[in-house]
């Protein structure tokens, strides 16, 4: 038989015991204990780390390839005294022809700048890059105008390229239009300007520029279109050759379209206004 005193003592003991453990009650509640056991904090952190490592592992190869592609530049300093044996543009045209099931010849004769008509030198600079001798590789006003035009068009259509930029593309780059290729073009252009004189850049450009199907360089262009050497070109003939440079495989100076004739006339007026460039 349990006495009232014993029952009271039992209640008092239980009360004291509950008072002692009550601060721990929230952390020891079944719900809290169950949650802590099924979703430990360390597991969530481990999963986050694994995701981060996976993303880094996937991105690193891409970043490495872009770094190599952008920053491992061709050694343009060799062009001070050595002429290129072939250009990226020539190889691209050959590959395009082979993809269509035929081959094209390559009409190309290298000549020093001193053997190219001063009229042609003037005409090309006037038509392609009027500030060539004063800028450091880039015509920022032209680039700004091209950027606004491309923004309105919604795609890359116009480049605003200088002669040095065109040389970089002809020598080393593919014909695709992308921001990554423009970045590489920028770096190569800077390198060309740093290592070569303006006269050497112009000489290289005039000797590798495309002037028709399989026709490269001023000497080959003069023979192909006018049956003469580039040193003997008149101002009128030089203006025609400069006029077809933007689309040399489409235009022919002997087939004078209205648009080509207008471009020729503008170039010829610029030649007549400017003094003849001195012999290099």
Language-model region placement:
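Residue-identity detector for glycine
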Residues: 8-15
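N-terminal Lys/Arg-rich, disordered targeting/topogenic segments
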Residues: 17-50
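Juxtamembrane regions of bacterial inner-membrane/periplasmic proteins
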Residues: 39-280
